[in-house]
Amino acid sequence: VKIFRGLILVMVITFGLGFYGETTQAAASTLQVGSKGGDVWDLQYRLKALGLFNQQLTGYYGTYTKNAVQSFQRNYGLQVDGKAGSQTWQALKKYSLNQSEMDIMAKVIYSEARGEPYVGQVAVGAVVMNRIQSAKFPDNIRDVVFQRGAFTAVDDGQFWLTPDKTSYLAAQDAVRGWDPTYNSLFYFNPKTATSAWIWTRPQNVTIGNHIFTD
């Protein structure tokens, strides 16, 4: 009985390791010309959000997608091979958003900055992108936005309001690198701010009703 149980245990471990290896390998697979599916669609969406892919999203990795990937790789100092491997994906996730993440960005902008001038709405989005790219904050928009106490609109529920078209345009501009805040990581309204700490931050610029700080 002990031998039989031991054999089963070995089989389970072997199968589990094999399955894990296959899963890991699949997750790390490189997209290239000829690839197709949801991952390619996501890749195209991110490249389109960055203004590098101007075609319809097809889910097929063709010449247009390869050219867009090469442009991204050149822009961000990566090896220019036209393939979406692990390093390219890592950079894409740092400097771009997928569709659901773009929805989050638009919600933040609308709930935090509706009524602000357009540049002020872009500025709020830029702060979000700056946090994603900063080692001081989480490396994805969900964790940045829902970090405890990070955004008043999340705390008071206004985040869940439906964003308008302008919010999406501002989100797109922020993702594409427009940063009128000079790399700010925080902002506040001096008329309503209750935190003494925020006033100690070095101030970079005032846009509309918000002061943007390091």
Predicted regions: what they are:
Residues 41, 86-87, 103, 122:
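A generic alpha-helix surface/boundary motif
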Residues 32-40, 48-90:
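Short acidic, glycine/serine/threonine-rich helix-capping segments at coil-helix boundaries
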